[in-house]
Structure formats: structure tokens, C-alpha cells
């Protein structure tokens, strides 16, 4: 029988972020975003794959029934003190496994590379804070760093809804209750979990992912009723985030929703992880701190992406920072290369970045003189 534990430990010891297991391929590790084969064993056979499926489901008929019905399965797994989030899906009717390795240490806010204004926003008594980005952009890390920070500094009840639970928090100054979302788990859906949260006397609600109208509906209601709500969305910028929220609703309802969003939204932190000069990944964020001007833009009948971006650019003294400014700062500080920075932009963006870098270098020279 294939030694799956050996494969998992090999990936963990090599510092992989993900382990990919597919029929007729050797196990593949993602290390600093580079896919690398595990050469110590031969290609995996159909029998190997089925043995691995048996290993992860461990005779649990509930898990097997869920997989047979949904054709996908998410589960948590622990080995030698390390935690993994395992996704099982199908390819040509054969299971495919993707295991995300979760670091055992809770992320610290001070290590994120985010400005202190984000920490201050997270200490607000009520409102909506969104952490956004595409897959593998570090959203869960930021979310859990904020939970960890609040847990150690404030006397609050924090309720989290996650699918699955990645980092396990112990109550410190705050009381933390973590719930896993999914059929047969702590609550069946994010929206159901949020509705029940209204009866659980929580101060802060953390939503692992907002991806449908039902969830954003009750999240907005929760924020409006005096709670702090922190959630994630799969969007790459503040303007796209607002568009996504409004897109959940019919046109006839959007004006009402705009007013609600403009009144409860406090910040959008949109982040990307970019290959750094030290073979690491560097977080480059866009941060929109919502003030009266940005609230007014959200309430407009129509607003453009450029209006939101310009508002962010001109409100740096309030703590906002545009993506292009974050890129420029990362290049100037030599954390990322100019080549990697330009890969994130279109032609117009590259021109703006070059102009901004020239201005920053000129100011630096003038300060020396």
C-alpha cells in the first residue's frame, strides 16, 4: 500500500504550501509557487489513488456519501502536529487530491506587512471589513492574524464561520467560538450560521468567505445592527468588491443596498502575493479606508473603477493606499523586482508605475542633497 503519510511529511519538511496527488503522476509539491515533483517514489497508480481515498475518508460513510453526491469534499487532517486542508475532487472519474499545509503557528499581524491603520480599523466596535484577493493571496492568513490580534488585545466574543477551520485559536483576552460550515458540521451554510450568530451575543463575526446574496444579506444586517463583521471575498480590488456585492442584487434593489454598504463598510484590504527578490512571497495590498467621500461614491447611481482608484490615491493621509503605490514601495525597498511589479499591470499601469518610481527616486535624491 502507498505510504501517504510519507508523502505528506516529505512535503511538509520541504516547506511546500500545497501537495497535489493525481493518477499517473508523482506527487507534486508547490514550493514558493513552483511545482516540483517528488522523485523518491514512482508515478501513482489507480490502486494508489484509491488507497489514498480510503486513507482520507477512513471508512466514514458520511464523508463518502457527501463525495458521491457533491463530487467534491473538503476535510481537515492532522499529522505530526501539522494541519492540512484536503480537497478531493474528480478527474476522469478518479479522485484528485489537493492538500494545503496550514502552518501550526498562528499568524502575527506584525509579520503581514500591512500598515497599522488596518489594526486600528479592526478595533472598531461595528461595521464591515473585507479582506479580498484571488486564490492563494493570503486572505486566510490576514483574517486569522486579525483574529489573533483582537484575541490578545480586546475583551470581545468572537464567532468565526469557516469552511474548513484552518487555524485553531485558543481564547485569550477574548472568548473565541469557531464553527465549521458544511453539511453535517457545526452549521449547514454561512448564511444559516450568521442568522444564528444574531442570537449568540457575539461582538465580532468572522466569515470565512462571502460568495452569495444570502451571506452578504445577513452580513450587512449584522454590521448594521451594531456588530463588527470581518469577511473575505474572491475579488482583486476595492472597486471590484463593491461591484460584486451590488451584482448579487436586482437593479431595483441596488440603490437601497448602496446606502447600506456605504454606511457600514469601513475598509477593503485587497491583497496579492508577488514573487520577491529573496525567493519569498511579498504581500502587496490595496487598502481602501472608507470616509465620507468614498461613501458618497458608493451611493452614486453609477461610479467607475477609476473614481474609486483616484479616491484611494488621494486619501493616503487617511490610511488608504493604491495598489500601484504599494508596488512602487515594494520596488523601492527592493523587496520585489521591477519586472515582477510590471507583470501585475497593463501598459497604462506600467507607464504610471515608471512615472511614480521616477518621482519617488527624485524625492529621495533631493532629501539627500
Where are these regions (language model features)?
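Short, flexible helix-loop junctions that flank or precede catalytic/ligand sites
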Residues: 1-369
Amino acid at each position: 500500500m502507498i505510504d501517504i503519510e510519507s508523502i505528506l511529511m516529505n512535503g511538509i519538511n520541504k516547506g511546500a504550501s500545497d501537495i497535489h496527488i493525481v493518477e499517473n503522476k508523482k506527487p507534486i509539491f508547490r514550493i514558493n509557487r513552483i511545482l516540483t515533483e517528488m522523485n523518491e517514489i514512482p508515478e501513482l497508480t489507480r490502486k494508489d489513488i484509491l488507497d489514498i481515498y480510503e486513507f482520507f475518508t477512513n471508512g466514514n460513510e458520511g464523508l463518502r456519501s457527501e463525495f458521491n453526491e457533491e463530487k467534491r469534499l473538503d476535510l481537515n487532517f492532522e499529522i505530526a502536529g501539522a494541519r492540512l486542508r484536503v480537497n478531493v475532487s474528480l478527474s476522469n472519474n478518479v479522485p484528485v487530491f489537493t492538500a494545503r499545509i496550514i502552518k501550526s503557528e498562528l499568524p502575527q499581524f506584525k509579520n503581514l506587512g500591512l500598515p497599522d491603520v488596518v489594526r486600528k480599523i479592526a478595533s472598531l466596535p461595528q461595521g464591515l471589513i473585507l479582506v479580498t484577493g484571488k486564490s492563494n493571496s493570503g486572505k486566510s492568513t490576514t483574517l486569522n492574524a486579525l483574529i489573533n490580534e483582537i484575541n490578545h488585545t480586546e475583551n470581545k466574543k468572537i464567532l468565526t464561520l469557516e469552511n474548513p477551520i484552518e487555524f485553531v485559536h485558543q481564547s485569550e483576552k477574548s472568548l473565541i467560538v469557531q464553527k465549521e460550515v458544511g453539511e453535517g458540521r457545526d452549521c449547514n451554510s454561512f448564511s444559516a450560521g450568521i442568522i444564528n450568530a444574531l442570537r449568540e451575543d457575539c461582538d465580532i463575526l468572522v466569515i470565512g468567505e462571502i460568495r452569495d446574496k444570502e451571506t452578504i444579506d445577513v452580513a450587512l444586517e449584522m454590521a448594521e445592527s451594531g456588530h463588527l463583521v470581518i469577511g473575505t471575498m474572491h475579488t482583486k480590488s476595492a472597486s471590484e468588491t463593491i461591484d460584486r456585492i451590488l451584482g448579487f442584487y436586482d437593479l431595483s434593489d441596488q440603490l437601497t443596498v448602496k446606502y447600506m454598504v456605504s454606511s457600514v463598510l469601513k475598509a477593503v484590504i485587497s491583497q496579492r502575493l508577488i514573487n520577491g527578490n529573496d525567493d519569498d512571497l511579498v504581500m502587496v495590498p490595496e487598502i481602501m479606508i472608507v470616509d465620507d467621500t468614498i461613501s458618497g461614491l458608493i451611493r452614486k447611481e453609477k461610479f467607475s473603477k477609476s473614481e474609486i482608484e483616484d479616491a484611494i490615491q488621494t486619501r493616503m493621509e487617511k490610511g488608504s493606499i493604491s495598489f500601484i503605490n504599494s508596488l512602487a514601495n515594494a520596488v523601492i525597498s527592493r523587496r520585489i523586482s521591477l519586472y515582477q511589479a510590471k507583470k501585475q499591470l497593463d501598459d497604462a499601469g506600467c507607464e504610471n508605475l515608471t512615472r511614480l518610481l521616477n518621482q519617488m527616486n527624485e524625492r529621495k535624491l533631493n532629501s539627500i542633497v
